[in-house]
Amino acid sequence: MPARTTQMLRDTPDAQARVSEAESLVRAARLFLFDSLDRLWATLLATGEVTMEARANARLAASHAVASAVRAIDLMYVAGGASSLYASCPLERAFRDVHAMTQHIGVHPRVMHSTGRVLLGLEPDTPLL
């Protein structure tokens, strides 16, 4: 329940809309990630190798999944209002955890640069791919 109100957060139209948007973000990102990993695995089984394109696509999907998770949690964090600031609120922990994920080298913004290079037919500029 948000601070200074008797209405449950789940009963507010704003929270309901944000939940819908967050759900669509997470589901779409999950499908993209699983699809890219399925394609990578199929390529590996068929050829014994993983192509640069498949690796770039999987890395892109992972980065997108993290960005989508951040956006989804941010939507809920804002909906929670000032209550989201308190350690007793589950949104506070989710906010910290999801933003901590953004600091991982595997989803660093530079990954988008490298995957973009591969998508444009250029060599990646990082050994991570």
Report residues per predicted region.
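Generic structural signal for well-ordered, non-transmembrane alpha-helical segments
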Residues: S20-R27, R59, S63-V70, R96-H99, ...
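Short segments within alpha-helical structural elements
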Residues: R71-V78, P109-H113
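A structural signal for alpha-helical segments
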Residues: Q7-R10, D14-A17, S24, A46-L60, ...
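A short pocket-lining beta-strand/turn micro-motif at the edge of beta-sheets
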Residues: A69-L75, A82, L91
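Extended amphipathic alpha-helical segments enriched in small hydrophobics
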Residues: M1-W41
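Glycine-rich phosphate/cofactor-binding loops in nucleotide/flavin-utilizing enzymes
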Residues: A82-L129
